[in-house]
Design a protein with these regions (language model features):
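Residue-level signal for inorganic ion chemistry
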Residues: 35, 54, 89, 104, ...
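Phosphate-binding loop of NTP-binding sites
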Residues: 5, 85-214, 218, 224-230, ...
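ATP-dependent carboxylate/acyl-activation modules
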Residues: 104, 313-315, 437-443, 454
């Protein structure tokens, strides 16, 4: 973060002195002299309990929901909502800079699309990106606070659980272009219908300037029904839709990556290669290409830069341990992403394929159907065994069994490990995927300790 006067950073929240602010922090362990410390109340940890210590350690201002003992009143900024205060400060800071920025949202594929955007934009200049999936009221501001005078490009991921959240984030970030990857069933539990999810994702439009490009998936069933503001420039990307502005044709995908041609109605045809397996990642690459080229970046260089993509975290990360190929995809899960991950497993050359799949959360009334379909898709992908983990995954195991798959349903992590030890052997390919709170990442790390090293 570049130094900014407190009265400028905190404008709209309080009348502050023009002291120099060098950072905005929410973790008391990262407090440094000249920072603003923001207190977030939580179920397990309440930031207010650390406010006095933060002030003693050099914080210039404390943003809190109520007065805090040990912090002078003239150094306490009282706000009703810490998240909205973070957004306001980030918006004030964002006004100091003018990078070309892409905002990314959607039900599935946000983080992969963000990483493709980063690969493309980095080919043209210094680029800032959302780290991990820091895409909420804290993560988006923290990304924006990393802007500096020499930032030429940026890509910001925006997530949501409820209506109104994307609007708040996009008005704060004010991207130059937007991407909506697809509309699925993630967060159906909170929003009720896919149509409501569509409305929530379309909120990204409110932060885009007049004439801004908005890249949308032409193959998604709902996005073509969206009402797009006439002041924006929609650019449709896809594989199947013949009328898409940017299409992928001649797609060949395998364990080591995917090749295809980009057919662009505006700029021509380009060869593309990406180091990812699965046709779903082609959509993510197309989205990044479409948004970047409509910001005026050279199309041939954008297409070539897709090859520099690198996988992050436990998102379809393919590794080999003890002679076994693992697809680590433990961060999140929805029916759409399960189907995509199973297609990657199917494409691997290993003789035997095993799926370790856990519960998908926040699906609401679509939960049983989504888990049942996942079991059917596992069978269609030719898995030799399915280990289903969690109460919701019983339907998954039953559906796979009905299709002739050797499937078991586990209620505990120890049961899962027992079946993994029983089923998995060197030479196998194993897909590991579930919602993050199911803890499959930790379970997988435990199993790795049992495998031969080297």
């Amino acid at each position: 973060m570049q130094t900014i006067p407190a009265n400028q950073l905190l404008a709209g929240l309080t009348l502050a002195e023009p002291v120099a602010i060098r950072a905005v922090v929410t973790d008391s362990r990262k407090v440094e002299p000249g920072c603003v410390f923001v207190c977030f109340p939580g179920e397990r940890v309440d930031g207010h309990d650390y406010a006095a210590g933060a002030y003693r350690n050099g914080a210039e201002y404390i943003v809190a929901n109520h007065p805090v003992e040990g912090v002078p009143a003239d150094r306490t900024v009282i706000v009703p909502d810490s998240g909205k205060a973070m957004i306001r400060m980030a918006s004030n800071y964002r006004m100091l800079f003018n990078p070309r920025m892409i905002g990314v949202t959607g039900s599935v594929g946000k983080t992969t699309t963000k990483e493709f955007c980063y690969s493309v934009l980095s080919a043209f200049g210094k680029t800032l990106k959302t780290e991990g999936n820091q895409n909420n009221d804290i993560g988006v501001p923290n990304t924006l606070f990393r802007l500096t005078d020499d930032t030429e490009y940026a890509v910001v991921e925006m997530g949501m659980d409820h209506a109104g959240e994307i609007e708040r984030l996009t008005r704060c970030a004010r991207p130059s272009a937007g991407i909506i990857t697809m509309i699925g069933v993630s967060h159906l539990e909170n929003l009720g219908t896919r149509e409501n999810i569509l409305k929530a994702k379309m909120e990204i439009c409110t932060g885009l300037p007049d004439g801004a490009p908005l890249a949308l998936n032409a193959d998604n069933d709902l996005l073509p029904t969206a009402s797009i503001p006439s002041r924006l420039r929609p650019v449709w990307f896809g594989i199947d839709a013949a009328n898409a502005d940017v299409r992928a044709v001649d797609v060949v995908t395998g364990a080591n990556g995917t090749t295809f041609k980009i057919v662009d109605t505006q700029y021509g045809t380009f060869d593309a290669a990406i180091p990812t397996a699965g046709i779903h990642t082609v959509y993510d690459a197309l989205a990044a290409y479409a948004a970047a080229t409509r910001l005026g970046l050279d199309a041939a260089r954008c297409a070539a830069a897709l090859a520099t993509y690198r996988t992050t975290g436990m998102r379809q990360h393919i590794v080999e341990k003890g002679g076994i190929t693992f697809i680590e995809d433990c961060y999140n899960a929805s029916p759409d992403s399960m189907k995509a991950a199973l297609s990657v497993l199917k494409a691997l050359p290993n003789a035997r394929k095993i799926a370790l799949l856990g519960d998908m959360l926040e699906l609401g009334g679509a939960s049983e159907e989504g888990h049942r379909h996942t079991g059917e898709w596992a069978a269609d992908a030719g898995v030799d065994a399915l280990i289903a983990y969690g109460p919701r995954s019983a339907a998954m195991a039953e559906a796979a069994k009905a299709r002739g798959v050797a499937a078991v349903h586990c209620q505990t992590a120890e049961e899962v490990l027992q079946y993994v030890r029983q089923f998995v052997r060197p030479g196998d390919a194993v897909l590991v995927k579930a919602s993050h709170s199911m803890g499959l990442e930790q379970l997988l790390q435990e199993y790795y300790k049992e495998l031969p090293q080297g």
